[in-house]
Amino acid sequence: CDTATDYALAKAVRWGARVILSVPCCQHELNRQMKNEQMKPVFQYGLIKERMAALYTDALRAQLLEGQGYRTQILEFIDMEHTPKNILIRAVWDGRKKQNEKELQEIMDFLSVKPTLAALLEES
């Protein structure tokens, strides 16, 4: 699946969805891309890098949605003891596009990543 969540989110934005509820399961893309000399001592531990990549992925997804006019929240929807994949991205259209392009680009440059959702939203 990998980037399936990104395609679903981009499609929801293109369709003008008023509310988006997404439980992302696909966060491998950034794990493969993430490179940063300053973070090398942390990224050398595969498990840590994988978990950080998953969190960065969903945080960037939420911020990209805010740039499209959605107010977003990232929530736990089920107790951690049941599943570690318990993040819900809730996005509600309010039309106020957050001017966060510069900040997001700085983060993506720092991590040497280009999320699929960013590319898909640029196309639309």
Sequence positions of predicted segments:
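Class I S-adenosyl-L-methionine
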Residues: 1-124
